[in-house]
Structure formats: C-alpha cells, structure tokens
Regions:
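Short acidic/polar segment at the start of the alpha1 helix of CheY-like receiver
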Residues: 15-19
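Charged docking surfaces used in two-component/phosphorelay signaling
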Residues: 20-28
Length: 132
C-alpha cells in the first residue's frame, strides 16, 4: 500500500457493532479510519483538525440525521464524499440525498465487496495489495 493513496474515512453510527465492523472493513481496505457514535461527536473530531475525504453514516440517527451531518461537514470540507448506509430502501431518500447531492447509498445488510465497490466509486481504487 502506498500511504499517499490512503484516504481518511469517518464512520458515524450510533450502533457500536456496526460502527466497529464498518470501521474494521474500511481499515482492511487500507484507509485511515476515524469513528464517532453521533453527529455531534463527528463534528467535534473534525473541528479539532481531522481532515476527511469520505463520510460513511446512517441516514436515520438519533440527534442529528446523516444528511444533516453531511451538510455540516461538507461546509467544513468542500468536496467531501458521502456514503449513506441504511436499512430503509426509500425512494425519497435516494432522490433527495443521493441523486441530488451526488452521494452514494448502500443498503443494509451489505457485503464486504459491496462496501469496497461503493468506496472505490467515490474515492478511486482501494490502495491495498492485500486480499480482502
């Protein structure tokens, strides 16, 4: 892996198991991973100087929704890529938050390969030579 190819990915989910699992997968792909259990926690991380290239967040979350978080982080990091993960397959979510804003959506449950494909579509090839 060439470290210059690695991107920093912020994984935000209020469910610890999902946050840990997605973070582990993204790390195995060769990226640097930051995690947060809420939108508020994510904003604190970013305001303390942690640059990110990709936000992976649930659409529906207590406190601050994924789209609201994405809007706030995009204001701080123009060009931020966003991947929503959701158990809801709702066409208005897809239209409003994915198509109109150029973000991506991955339906739960998903496979490692599906996650890798979405990340590659947003950030380019995953910078690893290891088999995942």
């Amino acid at each position: 892996m060439e470290s210059s190819d690695a991107k920093t990915v912020l994984v935000v989910d209020d469910e610890p198991e999902i946050r840990k699992l997605v973070g582990a997968m993204v790390s195995r792909f060769g990226h640097t991973v930051l995690t947060a259990d809420s939108g508020e926690h994510a904003l604190t991380l970013i305001k303390h100087g942690h640059p990110i290239e990709l936000l992976i967040t649930d659409v529906i979350a207590p406190g601050m929704s994924g789209p609201m978080l994405a809007d706030k982080l995009s204001a701080l990091h123009p060009g931020l890529k966003v991947l929503y993960i959701s158990g809801y397959d709702n066409s208005h979510i897809v239209k409003k938050y994915v198509v109109e804003k150029g973000h991506a959506l991955l339906a739960k449950p998903f496979t490692v390969d599906a996650l890798r494909e979405k990340i590659e579509a947003l950030l380019g090839p995953v910078p690893t030579t290891k088999s995942v």
